[in-house]
Amino acid sequence: DWIAAHYREAASLQEAARAVSLNPSYFSTLLKKFTGKSYTELLMEYRIERAKELLLLTDAKVYHVGQMVGYEDKFYFSRIFKRVTGMTPVEFKNRRREG
């Protein structure tokens, strides 16, 4: 899976499409057709799933977890994490460890 191998990088749609020898527009259309999601949504969801694992299984700081999954800006990482999970990374880490 290309996303699994490249999610830590600034992995663009163009690079993903090139990896499978498709035009980016056509690749995007196929992704949407077969997954119901855009490339950006798939990448974001994959990154957040990895972040959740790291938050639960390590003592890494939130900003470091964000960097490990491809987000250089800690505020942007927190915003995206909250959009996907409904809570901030700190809230997620605290709730999961309490429960």
Tell where the protein language model's regions lie, with residue ranges.
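Residues within the alpha-helical elements of helix-turn-helix
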Residues: A19, M68-V69, V84
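…primarily DNA-binding HTH/wHTH and HhH modules…
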Residues: R79-G99
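Terminal helix-turn-helix DNA-binding modules in bacterial transcription factors
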Residues: D1, A5, A10, K33-E72, ...
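Short hydrophobic/aromatic patch on the recognition helix
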Residues: F27, L31, Y76-F77, F81
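C-terminal accessory/binding modules appended to enzymatic or scaffolding proteins
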Residues: E15-P24, S28-T29
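Residues within helix-turn-helix
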Residues: Q14, S25, K61-H64, K74-F75, ...
